[in-house]
Amino acid sequence: METDNKDTYTLFINACVKKGSRTKRLADCFLSKLDGPVVETRLHETSFPLADEAFLNRRDSLIAKGDFNNPLFYLARQFAQADEIVVAAPYWDLSFPAALKQYFEQINVTGITFRYTAEGTPVGLCRAKRLTYVMTCGGTFVPEDYGFGYVKTLAQSFYGISDVRLIKAVGLDIDDADTEAILRKAEDQIRDNY
């Protein structure tokens, strides 16, 4: 689905890499509750450009010229035009998969996803009013200010997305954990609360 237009859609940013991903399972449950088309961006299938000096100079030049229709900014336009955002990212090493960080670096474009005031304060330019972050974790040590906190801060402070929610299932790999029961409980909560 081409998204460089005014169509209404939910953008699903999929940072899950494993077949049978538990995070993707919960995201699919949540997505099934939404109306309208879903555009999926699979980060493990996305080739991000190397952010070397030549790339940054080219990017900065395009931004300075206001050439926001350049293909380099496709992901940023797609993000900015979405009516709702869903991010699925397993909890890895106190954060999320590296591809998600690359994605955010790619879409942080002054003039598309945000702008600065004269005082240097970012103001969001994104259409979405809600971002839902879906994650699972094998353990139980999951400080929300790590991976989710980073995404929440970007969404609220840069993109203008005020409603940022977290759906999670944790303790999935603890000895004697009933993984299926934990996932079913999370799915029931999604069905009941969203």
Identify the role of each PLM range.
Residues 1-89, 94-109, 188-194:
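N-terminal beta1-alpha1-beta2 submodule of the flavodoxin-like/Rossmannoid cofactor-binding fold
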Residues 12, 87, 131-135, 166:
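Structural beta-sheet core signal
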Residues 2-4, 142, 149-194:
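Glycine-rich phosphate/pyrophosphate-binding loop and the adjoining helix
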Residues 80, 98, 126, 159-162:
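Structured loop/turn residues at beta-strand edges in well-structured enzyme cores
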Residues 109-119:
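Conserved nucleotide-sugar donor-interacting segment of glycosyltransferase catalytic cores
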Residues 17-18, 138-139, 171:
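Short, glycine/serine-rich, charged loops/turns that create anion-binding
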Residues 43, 136, 169-171:
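Active-site donor-binding loop signature of nucleotide-sugar glycosyltransferases
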Residues 117-159:
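Short, glycine-/small-residue-rich phosphate/pyrophosphate-handling segment
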